[in-house]
């Protein structure tokens, strides 16, 4: 049994890894550095790409139909009916059972098998995702050879793996394009990129089947494959060390290869021994020779650490013996302490000694388990030492109180919030009790009153003596704050007297405010003066008896009550109210109108509603003779100017009438056509020979509606 593991780059024969090339009973397997090339006894050549995993099968020169083949590729005998033969000889005829055929040829199952069931097509199922992918500009050069529709129909729609992995689907499409020598550079660093091993770089179109290696560098002939392919190639200046390796090295390092299959440069010396020293050297001609170590005598080191002695060792790189300082544990005399309960013995090392250092450290695992209390939000947990010095128990303690106890003022007493007494810091606050406030000690004069004034944020009120809360005018009239009165003077003048909220510090009463008002007022032409009916207003007002309308040009017009007028598509009306005449307006509303559509349908735009609205009027144009100016051409001859040529244009009547006698519609239709013609001679200038000819055409004498 032969297993080719592409990902691990190894070939097993009967569970034993064999080197390549391998050959047995006309079966050969070789690694070209870029692909496995497998030649079967039947003459089939199978090329399996290392990078993409695409398998390419060719018929070799030795292939013939008499050679027996079997397996997933079927029996190559030009008979498709026996291609689905299982390993036990049974032939599958129902496509629903194709899974049994695949499983019969399966080796040790180490992964999930995806079965292809060709029962879908793009007619009944959605292939738009696949078509959109392949219709990108980068894939257009291949469409003539591999159409997107065929690929999506035969591969994508029946291979559900492609639905979720579009990069693999595109890789399969590009592989088909490569068979026609069409190079498509479709991968980018950000889209479907392929990672190559260190030292290699991705190339979208490679033709040589065999990679250039240290083994074939002198006779490498760029062996060509039948088709292009994607591959990872060594960077410029480097070649592949071995076909089965992924290591790219400079050509100068190809001189030698050691027993571990590692490259060595000319002049390089290395230790090739496993358990003992064996120095080898690479010569310019690629030969590997054993050499003796070249050792220099070194002074004996001075060992200063405790229990450190001089030892002899062999350097694995130079194969030379040398003396170094090493630890001899037999020289140590350790002092091991006795640990108590809750402690454990710790072994440490000091840079000044080879001997171990022993000490006892606390071991929390040896302490008795104690349940952890749940601390409140205003508490935090501390560890309190128990009787054993190494063991601690958790304990909840209070946070420090940041808010001080408030200081209460007159009329207040200190109390605590009962909902906070269980906390570390209870909430204290002062409560106002008016009965605790002291009595006022003021004695007011006879014309003054004792007044209490509550102060915001203060429990007890303040007391003071003040006069009545009024205004006094001329020691006779009394006004409350906010009230006013009028005092008339001669002519058109008067003044108002208002009692303010502010106090007059001189009198103790509220302050009076005096305002002088000139009531002389000139009313407009559409207004009349009306005296004030109120005892609190000095002056009267101008009242509208008609309406004054201002226009956009700056002029104005006066309208009497009851008048209506139109201006800028708005109707105005002068209306009488209790406050005087006012102007009401009503905006005209026009139905929707499409002026462009009207003109396209040969309509005429008309205005109505005082020119504010538009309507489309269509006028029928009857059949008539019209004159058309045009240039007359005949081959290479044409008129030198526009010629007036008569034509017929216009509409004629037509109708469809149901005839009850025959049980169907009769159609009547007249056409606008000529009513007699006449000849019209036109001179034409011919550019070919430079001559002038007379050309005769016909034009209608008159036009009428006539039956067809």
Curated annotation (Swiss-Prot):
Glycan-linked positions: 553
Disulfide-bond pairs as recorded: 616-672, 637-686, 648-703, 652-705
Gene Ontology CC: extracellular matrix; extracellular space
Segments forming domain CTCK: 616-708
Keywords: Disulfide bond, Glycoprotein, Secreted
Cellular compartment(s): Secreted
Domain VWFD: start-end pairs: 1-113
Family: Belongs to the otogelin family.
Protein name per Swiss-Prot or TrEMBL: Otogelin-like protein
